[in-house]
A protein has these predicted regions:
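Cell-envelope/glycan interface and biosynthesis
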Residues: 1-169, 176-216
Length: 216
């Protein structure tokens, strides 16, 4: 947001960020019961499927990760700004174009949303509603996802098929991204660090893999 401010753009407000499992359960139960009251003949499976169209199951929401948030615009006394649709504003356009430079990705691309020409990834993400949601994945991951035009699900699949990615800048190695399969049921495992760098991070991908990022 400091970079956006330097570009003359302000008014960003975080609408939602971390949401606890219990809060997610409350939202889920409320929507499930609302639908149940309107459709008494529906089976439990039908109610669950309908509820999932607008509310994630507890534990599967992006908000539960603590890494995601939504943005909107507000500035005290600025009615013109406050009425703007984020995706149509200059603030929104700047964020969509530049967020990857700071380790953020737009999480749920749809056809022509957030910007005209965007290709829907709903068939991968499972989300088919307009959500102005960003997720922090780190600059190395966001850089690759941006240049390959991938959503998070596509990126994980790409890493499963190509478990070693090298990113160069001006001819110099900048990042190495390595995925190792450790298994879904592994509570402990060992990893060999063979790169000549002390600056690395590790994270699990919820697909049985460990992603290690080396920065040079």
């Amino acid at each position: 947001l400091n970079a956006a401010k330097e570009a003359g753009l302000e008014g960003y407000v975080v609408r939602e960020a971390y949401r606890s499992i219990s809060d997610q359960q409350t939202l889920w139960d409320a929507e499930y019961n609302r639908l149940k009251g309107r459709h008494s003949a529906w089976t439990d499976d039908e109610l669950i499927a309908a509820t999932k169209k607008s509310i994630n199951l507890p534990g599967t929401s992006e908000y539960n990760s603590g890494l995601a948030f939504t943005l909107y615009l507000y500035e005290n006394g600025n009615d013109e700004l406050n009425k703007m649709v984020f995706s149509e504003s200059e603030q929104g356009k700047w964020m969509y174009e530049n967020s990857w430079k700071y380790g953020l990705v737009f999480r749920f691309p749809l056809q022509d949303f957030p910007t005209k020409g965007t290709i829907s990834r709903a068939y991968k993400t499972g989300v088919n509603v307009e959500m102005n949601l960003f997720r922090f994945v780190g600059i190395p991951n966001a850089t690759v996802m941006h240049h390959l035009d991938m959503c998070l699900e596509e990126y994980i699949e790409y890493l499963m098929a190509h478990p070693h990615i090298a990113v160069f800048e001006d001819g110099q190695l900048k990042y190495e991204i390595v995925r190792q399969q450790v298994g879904d049921d592994s509570s402990t495992f060992s990893v060999s660090i063979s790169r000549k760098t002390s600056n690395y991070t590790m994270s699990l991908d919820n697909m049985g893999g460990l992603i290690t990022i080396y920065e040079y």
